[in-house]
């Protein structure tokens, strides 16, 4: 969304509608999370970056958003030399957390890049893990044909 009022307007529209996406009969519940990109990152670029995407969310300790962003800002240039980053973003509502999305050619490439980044001391970002609560969720996703990341 271009700005917070536009985000709020769309959220209100979805909450008020019994059929917000043209498939209301198939929806039991909807959850909404609002995020802002880490401020040092460029805008998301669409295109084909991989066949597999990892979407990972970490819950943060109170006060952890700013130091996490700083740690990532220092570490991302070396990390993206190994594989691209779609986005890293922090939650605007709910518990303190951040989500990042990485594309990979395959699950094997994901494992190799992660191992390489740790072996080289590139990742995780120095000072970042101390702000994590230990609660993490990781999803492996395959883009559909209509995805802007397919």
Model region roles, listed by residue range:
Residues 1-2, 59, 101-103:
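Short hydrophobic/aromatic beta-strand micro-patches
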Residues 3-16, 66-70, 106-119:
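Short amphipathic alpha-helices within nucleic acid-binding modules
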Residues 42-43, 61-63, 108:
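A short, structured loop/turn motif at beta-sheet edges
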Residues 12-51, 82-99, 103-105, 115, ...:
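Glycine-rich beta-strand-turn "strand-cap" elements at beta-sheet edges
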């Amino acid at each position: 969304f271009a700005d917070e009022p536009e985000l709020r307007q769309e959220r209100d529209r979805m909450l008020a509608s019994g059929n917000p996406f043209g498939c209301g009969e198939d929806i039991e519940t909807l959850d909404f999370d609002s995020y802002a990109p880490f401020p040092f990152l460029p805008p998301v670029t669409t295109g084909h970056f991989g066949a597999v995407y990892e979407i990972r969310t970490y819950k943060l300790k109170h006060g952890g958003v700013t130091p996490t962003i700083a740690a990532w800002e220092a570490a991302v240039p070396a990390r993206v030399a190994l594989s691209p980053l779609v986005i890293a973003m922090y939650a605007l509502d709910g518990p303190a957390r951040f989500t990042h999305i990485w594309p990979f050619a395959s699950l094997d490439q994901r494992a190799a890049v992660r191992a390489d980044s740790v072996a080289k001391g590139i990742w995780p970002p120095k000072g970042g893990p101390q702000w994590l609560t230990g609660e993490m969720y990781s999803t492996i996703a395959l883009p559909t044909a209509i995805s802007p990341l397919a």
